Amino acid sequence: MKGMAVTRRRFLQTAAALSASVPLHGFGAALTGSTASREPLRQFDYEQVQITGGPFGEQYNAIHKHYLELSNDNLLKVYRQRAGLPAPGEDMGGWYDLNGFVPGHSLGQYISGLARIGASTGDQACHTKVHELVDGFAQTLGPKNESILRPDTNLWICYILDKHFAGMVDASTLSHVSSAKEIANRVLAGAQPLLPAKGRDRIGKKDPPYDETFVMPETLFAAGELTGNPAFQEIAHRYLLDRELFDPLARNDDPFPGQHAYSHAIALSSGAAAYLRGGDVKYKRALENAFTRLTTEQQFSSGGWGPNETFITPHKGELYAALSSTVDHFETPCGSYAATKLARYLMRMTPEPADTRYGDNLERVLYNTILAVRFPDEEGDYPYYSTYSPTAEKVYYQKKWPCCSGTLVQTVADYPLNLYFQTSDGLYVNQYMPSRLQFHHNGAAMEIVQETAFPSEDTVTLRLHTTQPRAFAMRLRIPSWTSGAAILVNGKPLSTRATSGTFVTIQRNWSDGDRVELRLPQQFRTEAIDELYPETIALMRGPVQYVALQPEAGLEKERLRLPAGLKQVGPQRFVDTYEGRDVTFVPLYSVRTERYTTYFSKA
């Protein structure tokens, strides 16, 4: 997916075609219905937003290509083997094989991710692959509708079912696979005898028995809406972790220490789904309190959390201790999936956000965790943990096709959802990256094109194309990390002050060719790892964490004059000189296979 120069002629030529082929919604129409008060901000559809360049576009394109090239026969082989059908293709190894840790576990996630990418890009090859995988999967279910490859162990039933249902929901709604609804019903029917009576919690990384029901209610609610089958909703309510998670969080108690980090963070999405569908404000309070605890007590400067996949006990210096006790600091594709979903849900549930906390943390997580992972290879090697120890490296997980191979494609495929939100009277611009948004408003086809080299540069330009002038409010996120932000509309300064940590509203009658220019100065700052070790610091510039590239051993112990000693030597490349030696600092996301150090000692 390459960036496209947008001209008024091209827009006017394609507006009619877009109207017919892409479901572009108006602001008011998107917010009708009984849930409008619970969801004052709404996501745009995948079809309405495209990533058109920049580092996120590069990664998006690579992930698009990688998953599209996975062999259908390889992916379906374990299911065909279990069904006694001819099973061409190669064994995939690792977690995925019939004798692996969780056989065939991630097929539904691959289907889901490809459907989402296909919806945003319009790539028919993605939809074709989704159709083929769904059809192949359906052929293996047999008369008993068996989708669990090792039912005799009674382990990971919900873990796998959740992925099956996610795949069928997205295959139906995004790739228009007509059979996916009935397949979801068949999968549920076949699995009923295996389902636990209630959600089984897990603590830390203890051995089974337990099951992964944490995000399953979110998926079950969606499957219930898709199929009209009330059994999905009944099980969804049964699996909500009210006693263990949502009730204490709603009281602002802390249930996190010692718990498996990703499982409980992703479970918050189930609470969001319960709130949006049922309206119980307990779940909304729980998510708000959880976000505060995760971002102020649990996270590293990258936005990651959960060393050794376990939430720490706050205020005891455990994040600092983890820098030397482990190299497994954040379960990155899975954890970033949970963190980005949580931030988006809270954006959607918050009327007229008074500050930018959700968008700011979403930005931090995007740049320093999921964008910063190593690209997968063709052999089933995937990123899993991020390491924040001295002289770290980005390495693959020791087993092929792990859980993160599924959440990687889903998280990246969701990039378009992070950028813009709609309200009854306009839209929010929530993230800054090259992109295109298409929508209708009061009968006019509209397109907003975002052009920027951010964060390499400080400026963002939004160009509007429309078939007819229309009035609406455009709200721009002014991040809390910036100072001295400035906004121009058609070359003239906006009279409203661009205050850090707020959304600035531009209310006007928008015409074709209107242009908004935003400048977000990025300055270096340092952040302490926790309150007990304030001299151990990370280096931040804007939303981006900077690391020392190819550092000498022991650099983390030297007292550097950060950020005062930094001198720029290239785009996003800075040097500090210590005892006659140059130390180079670059964004964590730009590191590929080089060694790096993330935390330093304050001079």
Feature map (PLM): residue ranges:
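Solvent-exposed beta-strand/loop surfaces of large extracellular or lumenal domains
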Residues: 482-507, 526-532
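Structural helix-adjacent loops and short alpha-helical linkers that scaffold large soluble proteins
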Residues: 39, 46, 53, 118-131, ...
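Glycine- and aromatic-rich loop/turn segments at beta-sheet edges
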Residues: 71, 75-99, 139-155, 190-210, ...
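N-terminal export signals
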Residues: 2, 10-30
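C-terminal beta-rich recognition modules with glycine/proline-rich loops and embedded aromatic residues
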Residues: 236, 287, 359-463, 499, ...
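Active-site neighborhood of glycoside hydrolase catalytic domains
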Residues: 223-246, 264-302, 335-338, 342-346
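Low-complexity, Ser/Thr/Pro/Gly-enriched N-terminal "stalk/linker" regions
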Residues: 30-106, 124-148, 178, 185, ...
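Well-ordered alpha-helical segments within folded domains of soluble proteins
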Residues: 99-119, 156-173, 208-225, 259-276, ...
